Amino acid sequence: MGIIKTKGIILSESNMNDFDKMLTMLTPNGKIGCAAKGARKPKSLLMAGTQLFVFGEYMLYQGTSSYHINSCDTIELFYPIRTDLDKLKYAAHVTKVINDVTDENQNTYRILQLFLNTLYMISETDKDLDFILSVFKLRLLCLLGFTPQIKACTNCKTGENITHFSIRDNGFKCEACSKIDKGAIRISDSTKTAMQYIVLADPKKIFSFQISEENLQELNLVSNLYFNEKLEKEYKVENLF
């Protein structure tokens, strides 16, 4: 079997035998299972690069049922996540979501890019963790094919007097049309602008905006409800201990 060189990030790790690990890694070309022989030995050259959240470059060879890691070079450890329980909790939540929505043999370059940018924001900045999570969820939905209508009312197509977001109809509603959609959520102009920015911004700049605490509550509500509805699962940030 040939050697494969790829960049990837560790989504999960489990112990195997006395010193080995079984890993799930997200690469630009999908999710793969990897065995890391001897990675738990104290002096193993694989130890640093086979931990949860680590982004690295890996040399792999394909076995009968999984890939095996020959060598690895770490690119980013996201160390602050490991020393802050709140950061760890949110990073674990984001990682679970990514694990759920990705599969083998698919183009996951843009999802990997979003995942790395999100972990960087959690790890290296002091931005509100709920803000980071809301931006991540809304942008991820766009990558999964659930881009909301954020230019005009989903019903009458007007761009004027947008006052609500409709989970049912996947986008904005004007004041008049919102009256026939009891589930539509009222949003401010600032929240509307924030959502438009998240959907349309350059991938490297999606977190580069300010929002008030009141409007962040609206953004959190909309992104969480919309996310859970489209993925047909209720995601919550869980306590780790």
Stretch-by-stretch model annotation:
Residues 1-241:
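Non-catalytic alpha-helical scaffolds and adjoining flexible linkers that form interface surfaces
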